[in-house]
Amino acid sequence: MPREVILVDSQLGNLDSVEHALIQVGASVHITADPDRVATARMVVFPGQGSFGATTQAIVDGAMGAALRMVVERGDPFLGICLGMQMLFDQSDENGGNAGLGVLPGQVKRFPTDMPAGEQPGARMLKVPHVGWNDVQPTNEHFYFTHSYYVVPGQAEDVMWWCRYGRVEFPATVARGNVFGCQFHPEKSQWSGLRFLRSFILGGRG
């Protein structure tokens, strides 16, 4: 029997590709923007694209933020994707500083713009945002990223997989108890992304 997953519609990005990927790995997906429906969910996926700002602050301070915290505190499996992962943390420097949900300790900071692509003199500077395929450790699999900001975790043990962009090493995935997050887009990461989602759906973890 397919596992029911609540996919949160928080106006933070296109849900279609995430929904399709979840269906591919055997989930029964229900999209909702209703905090009451989210609060009673037994498995939640919280995707997001874009930036911290007025929309994310309204989520954090409002009924949806309370519903998301309720799922976490009850112990049901919860996955944040991209901005949805970043929002699990305490605070972001983006747009003058905005609070996150405070589920995990840590800050969200912008990639520096002065990172050379190599060690040779005159090497080109890496572009921000970080867009494209990159490998994660220790799995050595490749996933698709698109982000200008990254998490600086308050506790290194919350990090499951790491990724490197220039001189910055950042969490590709985080995990604590029933809470999981991925900075990459599993729905855009082909078979590696589907395997990650299938592992979450089947076992409540990434």
Where are these regions (language model features)?
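Glycine-rich nucleophile elbow surrounding the catalytic serine of serine-hydrolase chemistry
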Residues: 82, 86-88
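Pocket-forming structural segment of enzyme catalytic cores
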Residues: 91-167
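Histidine-centered divalent metal-coordination motifs
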Residues: 82, 147, 185
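Beta-strand-turn-beta hairpins that frame and shape the catalytic cleft
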Residues: 3, 140-141, 175-180
